[in-house]
């Protein structure tokens, strides 16, 4: 051990470093101890991995992914490089010298920038000399790499493989600087599929609607095999999220130039529960009338996003008492307030079988609607009031659908006679004929017995099966077919309809404004609910909620005598009417076994859009006959509350879900294209009445009422 005071000897020999690299160069030329092959244009250049990685971070990243096995070699295919350029570049890495022509200099500098050889990529050709570029702010050259460059592949070859053996000619050269890592014996199929998925990415992002509602397992793990077989793939490819690279064949094609023509109206989507249910029954309809390209479909919005505390448990609820379900408020956000009357559950449940009245009123500023609730009259349980047939209550066609069931089953517009007293009486008939709360399941399947078809057509109630829906019937029509109208025309038509709604009943609207766009020789589709097996024409999209079975009430329903409902049934016209230009209105909700409602009134110029009544002596009928005695209300399930100025649709029993459930309360189209109105019906007792959308006019009278402002 030497003392600290003794001097140290420093010996430096720069020639030795030079000689060592020259010896490595000789080994590289004679392929001694070379463990990597650089291939370009079908020829190979041997090299040492340590030298390449010491001179270039590009090779460092690639070679550390694929270490050569004992006695094996890594083959790097450098696409887009000339073999002469590659040789001169490798010679410079070993000797720090390079002799090139001016044409070759540009190729070598370009290759050096691709391979990130630090001592060469900073050079530039000026005046026939390679000089160092002035150091300043330099761009990050990684972002300037061509993104379309194919990666360099690496594979392990046997030691006996000759370095200068030409490659097969069918291999296409890759762009410069890209790398594909390729293991020996493995093909490039998964990796090319990954690139094809990346090319189809833009097409995948354009697709919309139902394909995104249910992602397939192939989307969630689209290319695990390509990642396992190609673990050292280029970072540009691994940056792509495999969940995005889904096969584009899973999605329907969208014609983009047709999309701006549609008017924004709310559209109901089928719930996932319906898609998975067994199609035990299907909705049957007549497909005799061809589709009209000019018709407009009012889409009804399905309220699916309910808050958890708002969704009741229908399984334990009593038939006539249940907590309120503000399902109409769920979708439009939490900004709407509910009054204390609405919030109070079962506050006054003494009056069973009665329904509170709900009014729709337009606020003066024209921005929103308010729903006004009225307490039911006390004398309705003793003597049901008879509405005034000459009241100022008429419904503009296409603005307020009769019921949720009718909104779903016939999305086309229903036109009513505006100047005839038949309109008011027709609506009274439709309302006073109530629904039976004892029928939890409405199976839209019609029996084919002659007695039912000829004498009393009705909805066959099958209480043993839950309501199921055939998803094959939900094929969506083309966007252009549903909305073959211009935005300006539709806006003006909506404004005219709302102007008539708000101005009172004395002014008759222009008939042309209330007609559907199919008035020029086109015909609105006629829906005949006739027999099983016929699908709704055109695959109209509509949604039904999940159905619940109630075994206790089913047994009561089977034992219930049919004679209790015979009285109101005799006065009602058949549901199915063989009319060429008629449109059958089916009132939603639950039906008594023999109760069916349909009405019609022809009008000049609107025969193909009218509701039909098979017999025209309806105005002469007594309205009291339409409501059975009060003693039978609870048994027959009739709930009627009629006043002289307003009309409320009969409500099915609370706590049960059916196609007319308030979960599917549609939005009414308003004057602006994006304005939507939710209507929720509440009774005074606070219990839920899942009524159909009430067609109630804004009341211009100044009578004192209990008004509840639902919307803020």
Curated annotation (Swiss-Prot):
Annotated BTB domain residues: 34-102
Keyword Ubl conjugation: no
Main location: nucleus
Biased composition range(s): Polar residues: 218-228, 396-410
Region (Disordered) location: 157-176, 212-355, 374-410, 653-676, 691-712
Pfam families listed in its UniProt record: BTB (PF00651)
Biased amino acid composition, Acidic residues: 702-712
Gene Ontology cellular-component annotations: nucleus
Subcellular location: Nucleus
Gene3D superfamilies for this protein: Potassium Channel Kv1.1, Chain A
Keyword Calcium: no
Stored PROSITE patterns: BTB
Highest taxon of the lineage: Eukaryota
Coiled-coil regions, chain positions: none
Composition skew (Low complexity), residue ranges: 277-288
Modified residues (Phosphoserine): 420, 671-672
Any GO BP: positive regulation of transcription elongation by RNA polymerase II
Alphabetical keyword list: Differentiation, Nucleus, Phosphoprotein, Spermatogenesis, Transcription, Transcription regulation
UniProt feature, compositional bias: Basic and acidic residues: 229-238, 303-313
Record's function text: Specifically required during spermatogenesis to promote expression of piRNA precursors. The piRNA metabolic process mediates the repression of transposable elements during meiosis by forming complexes composed of piRNAs and Piwi proteins and governs the methylation and subsequent repression of transposons, which is essential for the germline integrity. Acts by facilitating transcription elongation at piRNA loci during pachytene.
Record protein name field: BTB/POZ domain-containing protein 18
